[in-house]
Amino acid sequence: MFCLQSSQALQVLENSLRKHLPESLKVYGTVFHINQGNPFKLKTLVDKWPDFNTVVIRPQEEDMTDDLDHYNNTYLVYSKDPKHCQEFLGSSEVINWKQHLQIQSSQSDLGKVIESLGATNLGKVKHKQCFLYMVCQTAKKLAPSLMDAKNLVVSRNKLTPLDQQLFKFASLDVTHAALVNSLWHFGGNEKSQKFIERCIFTFPSFCIMGPEGTPVSWTLMDHTGELRMGGTLPKYRRQSLIYHVASQQIQTLEKLGFPMYAHVDKANFTVQRMVGLLGQILLPCTWNQWNCVPL
């Protein structure tokens, strides 16, 4: 096992992961931001170097003091050979299987290995799979071969124009974390709110302020750079607000040069239609999250 710390090695890793897009997307996006200053202070592990097979991005051990906090105890994994990475992922130096944790990857093929390791460590594993999309501007720059017409999601639905007398673009404040948490599908608890607070504090966030001067629609970035946690207050839905705030987010992050990608639940047809309005690329791989709980 090797822990990559030098800027040179991490840049080599980023360049290598780029060649394996889109399957490496979740890890690539994380390494990109590690190379931009590592704002979440993440740790990069590889099984060997420089000819690595498997990469794991995780928090530092000193930042994983709460055994029950799977929002913080998150591992991002990419492997060139998903069926033969069990020994590396099974190492206690790589993944602490005694904690409540989650593993995220753009490779569903990792499932059998993760489920096997969960069973070996007397734990329960729950898998969530979603559609994975890449913003067109990112695909053009990083993986132009994905710009095939059959991958481009386009919606012909008409948009409701933004009433700029009532609504104003703004950024979220950490004090808005409770509001975001209340509508986040994966949240709704104290630990998720703490995670959201850190995301708002660390990365650019975007919202639309309503007539009351409070956020009515918003979207954030998580610790991997993924566009996440979008939401709209129920009374303001069906006004295309989430489209307008997501469009603002994409325009701003494009200027910063950030890779942009997001997942959508397979049953969330409303957000899928919005993705169509934004003209994003549906990737051939999927967004995967395995929640592991020791019994």
Swiss-Prot record:
Provide this UniProt record's keywords sorted from A to Z.
Acetylation, Acyltransferase, Cytoplasm, Cytoskeleton, Microtubule, Transferase
- Record keyword Ribosomal protein present: no
Top-rank taxon of the source lineage equals Eukaryota
Describe the reaction catalysed, as an equation.
an acyl-CoA + glycine = an N-acylglycine + CoA + H(+)
GO CC terms in record:
centrosome; microtubule; mitochondrion
Q: Which residues carry this modification: N6-acetyllysine?
A: 41, 43, 48, 80, 83, 124, 128, 140, 150, 255
Give GO MF terms, alphabetically.
glycine N-acyltransferase activity
Chief location of this protein?
Answer: cytoplasm
Q: EC number(s) on record?
A: 2.3.1.13
Query: What InterPro entries does this protein's entry cite?
Result: Acyl_CoA_acyltransferase, Glycine_N-acyltransferase, Glycine_N-acyltransferase_C, Glycine_N-acyltransferase_N
Location in or out of the cell = Cytoplasm, Cytoskeleton, Microtubule organizing center, Centrosome
- Residues recorded as bearing N6-succinyllysine in the entry: 41, 48, 124, 128, 140, 255
Q: What class of enzyme is it?
A: transferase
- Subunit text: Binds to microtubules.
Protein task: Acyltransferase which transfers the acyl group to the N-terminus of glycine. Can conjugate a multitude of substrates to form a variety of N-acylglycines.
Family per record: Belongs to the glycine N-acyltransferase family.
**Record's protein name:** Glycine N-acyltransferase-like protein Keg1
